[in-house]
Amino acid sequence: MAYNWPRTLQDASTTSEPVELYRSLLSSADDHSMNIISIGFLTNLADLLRSKSDDVNSMSGPDLISAKVSELVVMGGYYPSGWEFNFGGEDPDATAYVVENWPKDVPITYSGGELGGEIFSGQSLTEHSPPDSPILAAYQWYVGRCSTLRESWDPLTTLYGILGLDGFERIGVKSPLAFANEFGYNSITSSNGSNAWVNDSSVTNQHYLRLADGVSNSSVAWLLDQLYIHDPIDERCFS
């Protein structure tokens, strides 16, 4: 993808380290204005939490997060309990550190493997995408075997991270998602990254997602496909 589409970055060695970039972006943001969407391992977020005052900002990592972040959205875990790759596949200690040390005044929403793993999107890309679509190319190269159909873990998480539960009306549809719980928290086994939801009425800042009542996997796949194939020149989301 990097070699086939125009880009401003020419040399990856000139990029900032992840924590430096996080601290710089958060420092320049308005208070409580940033959603962080995590669709991979949690190592960089753990390092952000451990970061200290520096030349970029005098606040510690947790204080900077509390001041600038409105919500953390995580593609990770399996609900109400289980094992999932983003939590346990590479750095389970980081998973446990982030989940256990994330500031209590900043909500966390989890999109689990059981949710996106049952929604197969991308089928419409080959027939309906603009021919120069980087989304089409990404799916063709990654999925392979003349297919663009794939599970929707990351796209679904990203869509929620952008719109939340209440923002879908901005694109003319009802929210296909809902919170699966009113209270409770994620408990992580640091040795392997497995998780289990603990019902605790005193904890109300953590949620995991489910499909809204009456919503099917296929209807969410259709919605994602419409966004994948949408021409960015067209200001309308749906015709």
What are these regions (language model features)?
Residues Y3-G117:
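Active-site histidine-anchored catalytic micro-motif
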Residues N86-S239:
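Conformational coupling and interaction surfaces
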Residues M1-N4, W153:
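Short intrinsically disordered, low-complexity coil segments enriched in acidic
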